[in-house]
Regions:
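Cytochrome P450
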Residues: 1-370
Length: 370
């Protein structure tokens, strides 16, 4: 890798699941600074302090705390408000008239609203999170001082909000995090802060990109778009999963060779798929390649929104399975459904622009009309 030295890269779906489910692979050496994260970009230091770099049993305790507030049951209850807000965004787009930047006007705004509701962030403060999240994930194009200043703003803001929720609890995730701190002295304020910020960073930036890529995928596949329009409610769930699996290819990016999931280090010699990963060696999963493994997926090169067997690993697997997966899936389903329900004639008006200086390489501009 350009950074952090050599790393084993797993492309086969079954081997990826085997490794991700094996507790002998850990991330502590990256968190402590003993090892540099082997990656295609210089991995942001802040992210190495977050939950995804913790290992059990501490990781398990922290994760359970947040999972209670992002349970499938709670996310299901949030769906109606997501649908309502998606339609408000579409109303605003229609009122302004085409062309529109689908990313700014729709795909980013929807997950920001939903995550802010979950965390209990006041409406007037929500636009700040777009700047803060992009800064956290920036790997070029911004100076270290600019990134540090934005991170400090975010940390100060969230610390203040957590303190408010401890004093005046509400029915939101920050209140639950603050209450947990009061009941459990082993959970520090810094841990609460990093969990909240990780949800902000991962909870809307990635989801916004999934929504954008999903819409673009349907715009580029006439047969799949027509099929989706014929049964939006019936196909929303499987369409969302296919976007998670196949969206990278629809962007014109290679099936393999992406950055992959966050790497692990083997604590002892471990055999995976006939290969021995030696103690101390790093290994990562390329989820795009694993999602196009012909041994796991039939006709993997084809976009099929009716696909039932879809064992993609875009949201990872095992103890590090994406914490916000229920919320991300719901937002992606709603984001795809409502835009095509309201604007069935949606069409692209230019190439998608991608920010290659960001860890997640998000689409920043997708001009559309209807």
């Amino acid at each position: 890798m350009p950074y952090g030295g050599d790393v084993w890269v797993i492309h086969r779906n079954s081997a990826a699941r085997e490794m991700l489910g094996d507790g002998r692979f850990v991330r502590e050496p990256f968190r402590t600074g003993e090892r540099v994260v082997p990656y295609f970009l210089d991995f942001p230091d802040f992210l190495k302090t977050t939950l995804q770099f913790e290992d059990p049993p501490h990781h398990t305790k922290l994760r359970k705390l947040v999972q209670r507030s992002i349970s499938p049951k709670r996310v299901k209850a949030m769906r109606d408000s997501a649908v309502a807000f998606a339609n408000e965004l579409i109303d605003a787009m229609v009122a302004k008239g085409p062309p529109a930047n689908l990313v700014h006007d729709y795909a980013i705004a929807l997950p920001i609203q939903m995550l802010s509701n979950l965390l209990g962030v006041p409406p007037e403060d929500r636009e700040k999170f777009e700047k803060w999240s992009h800064s956290t994930l920036s790997v070029a194009g911004m100076t270290e001082d600019e990134i540090a200043a934005n991170m400090m703003e975010l940390a100060i803001y969230m610390s203040g909000l957590i303190a408010q929720r401890r004093a005046e609890p509400r029915d939101d995730l920050l209140s639950a995090l603050a209450a947990a701190r009061d009941k459990d002295d082993t959970l520090t304020d810094d841990e609460i802060l990093t969990m909240a910020i990780l949800l902000i960073v991962g909870g809307f930036d990635n989801t916004a990109n999934f929504i954008t890529i999903g819409i673009l995928s349907l715009l580029r596949n006439d047969d799949q778009r027509e099929l989706f329009l014929s049964d939006i409610d019936g196909l929303a769930a499987t369409a969302a999963e296919e976007v998670l699996r196949h969206g990278r290819m629809q962007m014109g990016l290679p099936v393999a060779g992406g950055g992959g999931l966050v790497p692990f280090v083997a604590t002892e010699d471990v055999e995976i798929d006939g290969r021995v990963i030696a103690a101390g060696e790093a290994v990562l999963v390329d989820p795009s390649a694993a999602g196009h493994d012909p041994q796991a997926v039939e006709t993997p090169e084809r976009m099929d929104i009716t696909r039932q067997n879809n064992p993609h690993l875009t949201l990872s697997y095992g103890v590090h399975h994406c914490l916000g997966a229920p919320l991300a899936r719901m937002e992606l389903q709603v984001g795809l459904s409502e835009i095509f329900r309201r604007l069935p004639g949606l069409k692209s008006e230019g190439p998608a622009e991608i920010d290659m200086n960001n860890l997640t390489q998000p689409v920043t501009n997708l001009p559309v009309s209807w």
